[in-house]
C-alpha cells in the first residue's frame, strides 16, 4: 500500500514519487473530485480557501489550521512534521551571504582568508574579486573559452599545414568550407 493518500479521491497511491502524484493530480477522476468538493462548499467558502492558499504561497507562510481540506490537511498536500514550514533549516552560527543558496556557509576563518585579512572579516563585506592566473585570452575568443588543442598536442603556435588535394583543386572542399563560419573563427582558421 502506498504512502500518499488523496483526500479528494479517497485512495492510496501506489508510490509517493512526485511523478506518480503529478500523474494522479492531473487525472480526470481526481480533477472531477476536486471540482465536486469545492462546488459543495459554496462559492464564498471556496474563494476564501483559495485566497488563503494564495496568501500563504506568496508570503511563504507555514501551516495554518484554518486552511484545511478534507481529512484535515491543506488540499493537495501531505501531512508533515510538527512546525513544518514555520521556519527554515537550522543555520550554523557563522552563516553568511558569500555561499550560494545550496552551498554550506563558509566558516569565519575561510572568510578572513578570502578577504585577504589576517583576522576577522568585517560584517557585510562581500567575497573578494576572483582572480585567476592563466594564459591571455586569444583574439576572437570569448572570455572563459580555452584555445583548442592542435593536432601536435600543443595549444600554442601555428596550426600544422593542411594537406592540399592532389589533383589540382579537385576532391573534398577545404575544412573551412565544411565548417560553420563561427566555429572556424573560434578555432582561428579564418
Curated annotation (Swiss-Prot):
GO MF annotation, one: U1 snRNA binding
SMART domains: ZnF_U1
Cell compartment(s), UniProt: Nucleus
Zinc finger annotations (Matrin-type) as residue ranges: 4-36
Comp. bias regions, Low complexity: 109-124
Any single GO BP term: mRNA 5'-splice site recognition
Listed Pfam families: zf-U1
Main location: nucleus
Keywords for this protein: Metal-binding, Nucleus, Ribonucleoprotein, RNA-binding, Zinc, Zinc-finger
GO CC terms, sorted: commitment complex; U1 snRNP; U2-type prespliceosome
Composition-biased stretches (Pro residues): 72-82, 125-141
Sequence segments annotated as region (Disordered): 57-190
Gene3D superfamilies linked to this entry: Classic Zinc Finger (3.30.160.60)
Subunit structure: U1 snRNP is composed of the 7 core Sm proteins B/B', D1, D2, D3, E, F and G that assemble in a heptameric protein ring on the Sm site of the small nuclear RNA to form the core snRNP, and at least 3 U1 snRNP-specific proteins U1-70K, U1-A and U1-C. U1-C interacts with U1 snRNA and the 5' splice-site region of the pre-mRNA.
Protein task: Component of the spliceosomal U1 snRNP, which is essential for recognition of the pre-mRNA 5' splice-site and the subsequent assembly of the spliceosome. U1-C is directly involved in initial 5' splice-site recognition for both constitutive and regulated alternative splicing. The interaction with the 5' splice-site seems to precede base-pairing between the pre-mRNA and the U1 snRNA. Stimulates commitment or early (E) complex formation by stabilizing the base pairing of the 5' end of the U1 snRNA and the 5' splice-site region.
Protein name: U1 small nuclear ribonucleoprotein C-1
